[in-house]
Regions:
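Long, polar/charge-rich, low-hydrophobicity segments
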Residues: 250-253, 383, 387-414, 419-575
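Glycine-rich phosphate/oxyanion-binding loops and their immediately adjacent helices
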Residues: 362, 367, 377, 419-420
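Glycine-rich, acidic and aromatic/proline-enriched surface loops and short helix-turn segments
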Residues: 183-190, 380-388
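Catalytic nucleophile-loop/oxyanion-hole region of alpha/beta-hydrolase
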Residues: 237, 374, 404-407
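Replace the tail clause
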Residues: 1-368, 507-608
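Inter-helical turn/loop segments and adjacent helix faces that build the functional surface
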Residues: 164-168, 228-236, 365-372, 423-430, ...
Length: 608
């Protein structure tokens, strides 16, 4: 609808004439300015009871909003006001009854600034059970996922279910997770020929997506499927994770090593045209017999399932998990064909927060799959993030056209730091722990709210009509959820009490804030589990630079209760600076020693 309104109204001369005569029109990219987006989404929710995009706000010169809405047609239809009608009505009222609009703006601004206070709450399993129950209540047992159409992947909900089932043995949570992962793979929301997932499904079956692909969705889903493979060793999950990461590396990676925001849904002005096929096209490329069998496999029919053409999917294929191996070459040929037939445009912005998520996904896959290719991509991305976006107080949020823009916000610091920590787990280079700690220090120093939690913007950022704070997760985890996970991970990897105290304070704030709707902060609950359930750290003090075979096997497993650190002669000094509790861990007699630690206190070592 953003594209529709842009073409229908903002590219229309009649609309432009009215806008320019009576208003100062400002079009905001919500990805470049998520703080502005967050503030005015709350305005729309307060004034209308709902919110979404495109978001239309009319405000006074003092930035006080008095009208909010989402998509508006150029001309009124079916009792719905049109944009032209609205603009003329507001312009008339501004001339004749301005005080009424000013008063409405003041009232809306005052309501926006009145943020409810919540008391911290203790951490306990009941909150986890309540969240699992809320997800179960909206679970679609037939097609997987949660809620009805439109249906979103919500990878952070799935990651929560994975960890909750692991810690508690909850069979229902495990089934919800695994059925959803399978059904999303079978559907048209997954790109069977090129890898990666579309933004959301317009139906409950996951068949017909909104075809836009975004970096953050694919990074989070790659992470989710990688974790699922670590936990189950089901080959399908690894296949999907690798195909999704390979899509990002092939289609979204910039020359700098960073990653673009995503690819458009439209091709040649037609929604989804890039992804649609007819049997005739397939048979022309693959031959009559191979093409016919391939079409039967992927539900490509003469009737089509989307405006007369077909979205490839496996929903009707009872042998969906046994797609012939030889079809991999066919899928690649069709992928190359469609790239020339209907090329896609990319959104070539690079965002620090989204690249942090991609760093997490690449690093986790490098560790889980023992992949030097993914590790090299992750290290190159980390280098770009340090040099391109920067670290510390001068970090920038966005890179575009060779320039960096806008001061970094909470999400940028939190997700980049989590990415650095995942890269440490994959590479054992302790400099990444130090980078993550520097980012975390910026969060605690510049983003903290007096009553708990963290604002989206720093204390020295541009002042909007209110300072936004998001606690609940949305399409991606909230900055507050990410900060909670960051503090917990730093506490475990460094052994420093300051990070454990920060983690407890943040999670107690979130437990109080989200007491009635804990499923809305699923990513934070993953961090909470690390404080509720027993954890341990394994420090390997190696006699040389080689990673012991036993350690490689241990760290490839799914074990959220275990952190692994490797100390070699070359990394010993830097690791001791990053994680002081490892200073006394040393090899003996030319052999590696393994130390089991909890809370920075280590037991006597054992030999491999």
């Amino acid at each position: 609808w953003c594209h529709v309104m842009a073409h229908e109204s903002f590219e229309d001369l009649q609309v432009a004439e009215v806008l320019n005569r009576y208003f100062v029109a400002v079009k905001v990219d919500r990805e470049e300015r998520p703080d502005v987006d967050a503030v005015y989404l709350r305005v729309c929710q307060a004034l209308t009871g709902g919110a979404g995009w495109p978001l239309t706000i009319i405000m006074t010169p003092e930035q006080q909003p008095f009208f909010a809405g989402t998509y508006l047609p150029k001309n009124g239809v079916g009792g719905r006001i049109g944009l032209l009608q609205l603009l003329r009505a507001v312009a008339g009222k501004w001339s004749g009854s301005r005080e009424e609009l000013l008063r409405a703006g003041r009232d809306a601004t005052a309501a926006l600034r009145a943020m409810p206070r919540t008391e911290p709450a203790p951490l306990n399993e009941e909150l986890l059970k309540k969240a699992a129950g809320q997800l179960a209540a909206s679970y679609d047992a037939e097609y997987g996922g949660f809620g009805s159409a439109p249906k979103f992947p919500s990878a952070h909900d799935l990651i929560f279910l994975q960890r909750y089932a692991y810690h508690t043995g909850d069979k229902a949570a495990k089934e919800e997770l695994e059925n959803t992962l399978r059904q999303m793979y079978k559907g048209g929301i997954y790109d069977h020929f090129g890898g990666g997932f579309a933004r959301y499904s317009t139906d409950r079956e996951w068949l017909a997506p909104h075809f836009e692909k975004t970096l953050y969705d694919n990074a989070m889903l790659a992470l989710c499927y990688t974790e699922a493979w670590q936990n189950s060793r089901m080959a399908l999950y690894r296949q999907v994770a690798e195909a999704t990461l390979d899509y990002c590396l092939r289609e979204l990676r910039a020359d700098s090593g960073g990653f673009y925001c995503g690819q458009d849904a439209d091709s040649g002005g037609e929604e989804g045209a890039h992804y649609l096929f007819t049997p005739a096209e397939v048979k022309k490329l693959l031959g009559e017999d191979d093409g016919r069998h391939f079409c039967e496999c992927y539900d490509i029919t003469d009737e089509g399932n989307f405006h007369g053409k077909s979205i490839p999917n496996l929903l009707l294929n009872t042998r969906w998990s046994f797609v012939p191996e030889g079809y991999a070459e066919f899928r690649e040929r069709l992928r190359d064909y469609r790239a020339e037939r209907t090329p896609l445009a990319a959104d070539t912005k690079l965002l620090a927060s989204w690249n942090g998520l991609m760093l997490m996904a690449l690093s986790r896959a490098a560790r889980a799959f023992d992949s030097s290719r993914y590790l090299a991509a992750a290290e190159r991305l980390a280098e770009f993030m340090r040099s391109g976006f920067g670290l510390g107080a001068d970090m920038r949020a966005c890179a575009y056209g060779g320039e960096t823009r806008f001061p970094a916000q909470l999400d940028d610091y939190a997700f980049s730091a989590l990415g650095f920590l995942e890269l440490y787990r994959a590479s054992f280079d302790p400099v990444h722990i130090i980078s993550a700690a520097k980012q975390a220090e910026q969060i605690t120093a510049r983003f903290a709210a007096p009553s708990g939690g963290f604002y989206r913007t720093a204390q020295d950022a541009e002042q909007l009509i209110t300072r936004p704070m998001e606690v609940f997760d949305g399409a991606m985890p909230s900055g507050n959820s990410a900060a909670a996970q960051l503090f917990v991970s730093l506490a475990r990897l460094t052994g420093e009490e300051r990070w454990r105290a920060a983690a407890e304070k943040q999670l107690e704030f979130m437990a109080g804030y989200g007491a009635e709707q804990p499923a809305g902060m699923a990513f934070a609950l993953c961090a909470m589990m690390e404080l509720i359930y027993p954890t341990k750290e394994l420090v390997c003090a190696a006699a040389d630079e080689e990673e012991p075979a036993m350690l490689a096997a241990v760290r490839a497993k799914y074990a959220p209760e275990l952190e692994v650190l490797l100390k070699t002669p070359s990394s010993a000094e830097t690791l001791a600076a990053a994680a002081p509790f490892t200073a006394d861990c040393a090899p003996r007699g030319g052999k590696a020693q393994f130390y089991i630690c909890t809370g920075g206190q280590c037991s006597l070592p054992v030999t491999e």
